[in-house]
Amino acid sequence: SFENGLEGWTRVEYANGSKTLLEVVDGEGVNDSKALKIQQLPENDKCCVGVKRTLTDLEPDQMYRMTARIRYSDIPNGQGTGPVIFRPNSKQYWNSSRYLYGTELKNWTNVTVDFMADDNGEAEIVAALGFWQGGMANGGRSTGTAYFDNISVVKVTDELFTLESEYMRIFIEPSKVNISVQVLQQWLKNLDKIYLSYLELMGEVPHEGRKLAIQTTKGIYSGYWALAGYPILWTANGTAVEDSFSQMLQHDDWCFGILHEIGHVFNIGDTSWNWNDEMFANFRMHYALEKNNGKVYMDGRNGKQVFTGGEILDMYKIDYENTIGTKVNDNGIHYMLARMAASITWEPYKKTFNYLRKNGGSGTNKYDKFVHFVNTLNRFAKETNPDVDVWDYFSALELESIKKQLN
């Protein structure tokens, strides 16, 4: 509560806070108690302003739930996040409570956000109008008025559905779990295989080698299915989780979306060479699926189908065929880069990623980075076969189409 004013809290201005009203007011809290009020008028533009405090004596690497009660008014629909609570974290930028829009002053809205404590048993928490990160599709920042009260934090590791394997941990909202523990255990074993293959390809592991974590959250922008980081966020809005679990049961699906996000997590080291990690997250997955005979249930040439192992190349070939004649898309570039593996093997790719991870890229635009990548791959391919030239795998039409996409 805020009965003692802002004792223990500190005002924080992430964006445009010079004209933001932030105060503790009487009679606006639960049962007419005191509440934190934050107000940003539309004429002063969108903001992210709130209060923060650092929690101590938490259990390291355990899941905690921050809860607050909020009333709000005049929050433009779809503008930023509205009033939210969150834990600012450089390893996972995007986690927050669910977004609130419009006006609801008569009743209190309960919101929650789950987060992991740091290794030192600390965590910074924030209650704010608007979100600390502006680089999201809705802009992050907001205007309007919000009242916060009854902020609390409790450990919830045991309240979530939790399961772990050698390299993975999942923290899932229990109502989302619609398949057996045995099926999920097998999935985590499959993710362990993927993890080791990503390590083979990239030459290093992320997050100091700790187990990667996946957690469900309602505080995720509606356009996002999941977001990479530590932990990986998986939307609890809608039925994304349940649908994925059902596909695991029906099709032995390893879950393309989660494999993609883990692929992002392995974008490590000097990443200046990387012109598009949406593509390279899938490229890492491609290698891992081929090496482990993994399965994903995705759109094929005649509707949904299971792609097993190296069959995944054909999924990317579909886009290649549909776009190569004009401006090839990223999936088409993926196809062209991956098709050579059947001839030159994956070893030059491993050496290429390991080299680039340590040394970075060359060139200021995307096409220059593409050229640097292929030249590096070519250099390592020649170590095995001096007669090979990977540029020979690209036609003039293909290179022209790639230029149109990357310039």
What are these regions (language model features)?
Residues 182, 186-193, 197, 253-257, ...:
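Extracytoplasmic/secreted proteins, especially bacterial periplasmic and envelope-associated proteins
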Residues 405-407:
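Non-catalytic terminal regions of proteins
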Residues 1-158:
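Extracellular and organelle-lumenal recognition/adhesion modules and their flexible linkers in secreted
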Residues 162-259:
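Juxtacatalytic substrate-recognition/specificity segment
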Residues 166-168, 204-213, 261-264, 289-294, ...:
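Loop/turn elements at helix/coil->beta-strand transitions in domains of secreted/extracellular proteins
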Residues 242-308:
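Zinc-dependent metallopeptidase catalytic helix centered on the HExxH motif
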Residues 198, 307-402:
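Active-site-proximal alpha-helical
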Residues 201-215, 269-274, 296-300, 349-355, ...:
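Surface-exposed patches in mature extracellular/periplasmic domains of secreted proteins
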